[in-house]
Design a protein with these regions (language model features):
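Nucleotide/phosphate-binding site architecture used for ATP/NTP-dependent chemistry
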Residues: 44
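Short pre-catalytic strand/loop immediately N-terminal to key active-site residues, enriched for Gly-Thr
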Residues: 7
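Conserved P-loop NTPase motor core
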Residues: 2-3, 11, 15, 19-22
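Short beta-strand or tight-loop elements
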Residues: 4, 125
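C-terminal, non-catalytic interaction/recognition modules in large multi-subunit enzymes and RNPs
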Residues: 14, 23-24, 29, 34-38, ...
Length: 354
């Protein structure tokens, strides 16, 4: 389908992903999910099969009294009973089975991260892994370690980050025109004329939605490929020769080689975006470091983990794992060997180096 899309890699490894023992006697996780209804067994809303959420609860990484700010208590007994269905066939304790479920879910997610980075020639080791979603913080340290990454971040409002982004996302239009021809057979004026037509249409639509003409930013790009290929690469529009040279470089960077073939134009694209809505978030005050409100035992760890309320953390405060950081819409598990520093905006900056 020749429409602009966000390049995403989706896997079945959410908090509702169901664990089971397959016909070969192997523990599997996902892609089947319990969803929100009936949900994980620990929701006590009719779900009977073990999920990743149940596993995190049994390992002590989820607080049964802190889920949704304590408004929705989690039932450990229901999670325990559900996890027995995979523990017994494998000859494992319930806690061992829960640990296996989390490890398999982590590996599914780590593999997806490798597909989006290593397999595309991107070395993730110098990057920061950003975690969001209600369960993202429970797995972020393990995923960063799996990719040899030393830094991660759990942004403020992580559990509802997608909804927040939707609310402040700018109005936009993406328009395209298919025109298959050898790039160097096209005239610069011919391409400019198509762009002008697309821009006029998109600008008119945004103005009709109340966007001021002066607030519209325009981005021109084109899809190019080698003649005979079935896939293409998108590049910003400049001029014919510059785009041809840039395509050769990008193809070599993405696929490891370039070809001595004519470059073919496939689509001309225009993106029109209004100025984003200013987002003002409350800054955290600096002050005395808050203290944990509890200590909990986590399966597999000799030392107890401190439990902090995220809304009580101060700017500049530093934490050492193992620790749990709870909030209404998510929980962050700071694994042993990891450190957390709270920035002025309230983001949790994680690192496995001092």
């Amino acid at each position: 389908v020749a429409v602009p899309m966000v390049d995403m890699h989706t896997i079945g490894a959410g908090g509702g992903s169901i664990a089971y023992v397959d016909s070969g006697g192997m523990l599997q996780v996902g892609p089947e999910s319990a969803g929100a209804a009936p949900g994980p067994a620990c929701y006590n809303q009719g779900g009977k099969r073990p999920t990743v959420t149940d596993a995190n609860l049994l390992l002590g990484r989820l607080r049964p009294d802190a889920f949704l700010g304590g408004k929705m208590p989690l039932h450990e007994s229901a999670a325990y009973h559900a996890m027995q269905s995979v523990a017994e066939p494998l000859g494992l304790s319930v806690e061992q089975a829960a640990e296996g479920v989390v490890r398999i879910a982590n590996e599914h997610m780590a593999h997806a991260l490798r597909v989006m980075s290593v397999q595309r020639g991107i070395d993730p080791r110098g990057l920061t892994l950003v975690s969001f979603g209600g369960a993202g913080g429970l797995h972020v340290c393990a995923l960063a370690e799996a990719l040899s990454m030393q830094q991660a971040m759990v942004p403020v409002h992580a559990g509802v980050l997608s909804a927040l982004g939707m609310l402040v996302a700018p109005r936009s239009r993406q328009l395209s025109r298919t025109h298959i021809a050898r790039l160097m057979n096209m005239a610069h004026e011919q391409i400019e004329a198509v762009y002008a037509e697309l821009e006029a249409k998109g600008r008119q639509e945004l103005i009709a939605e109340g966007v001021a003409k002066a607030e519209i930013e325009i981005q021109r790009s084109l899809d190019l490929r080698y003649e005979g290929q079935s896939y293409y690469l998108n590049l910003p529009w400049n001029d014919l020769k510059s785009c041809e040279a840039a395509f050769h470089r990008l193809h070599a960077e993405r696929y490891g080689h370039e070809l001595d073939l004519p470059v073919e134009l496939v689509n001309l694209r225009v993106g029109l975006v209004s100025r984003p809505t200013p987002l003002t978030l409350t800054s955290l005050p600096a002050g005395p470091a808050s203290v944990p409100y509890d200590q909990v035992s986590l399966y597999g760890l000799e030392q107890s983990a401190a439990v902090y309320a995220r809304d009580g953390l101060m700017a500049g405060q530093q934490l050492t794992g193992p620790a749990l950081i709870t909030e209404t819409v998510s929980t962050t598990y700071l694994a042993p060997g990891w450190y957390c520093k709270v920035d002025a905006a309230g983001n949790l900056l994680l690192s496995n180096r001092v």
